[in-house]
């Protein structure tokens, strides 16, 4: 976010300096010259951030596990996220963050409507460094894959229990050593028909909280799936709400199936005003 505002400041100063030094102000249409220069400078600074991310991705070996979040990669990634949220014209209302203990790390779970969901959560939940469990395909995206790997993102192999456990233990090691929080979407994929209710939850995803001995923070997002439909001509009001925190002791003594049902019921009550009868996987 700092880089974004810095880019605007540089754009403003640069456009004003060029306008004054060249004596460009004269006719009414000359007003647009500093405006164009302003956005030109801002765009150039953001383009440099993307170029920097590309260069950083060249030094990311995705086959080599990371033991902590790289601050430089995280800074660049979060700055670009903040810029994309701003440019999408998403107006984010955050509710209930006061329920989080700033000294505590969490497993953050949320419904999944849009690609903007993890971006908004990362941008607004700032008490601890945060990474997500992501699908394998995201690590194959040019630039993005290398950067998120260095940010501590992991891919959980749901088809291989042994590999999944290995990844969960690795996550717990990072949580213990660095105090990170982790986010996961228990629906497993984006819900393209949210009007029908939440998708079945993958209860195994909550094993991260049990193995790591951390609380579960239950969030919901609202209307993030409308952002791409309204962009660029209309802004979109979206919400990120923290519904409840399931304490570590309850997480430890409750089965993942029961935890998943509790979280899913809580989310559906908040989103639809009722619990929708669907299975938990």
How would you name each of these model-derived features?
Residues 79-80, 92-96, 118-119, 168-171, ...:
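A generic local structural motif
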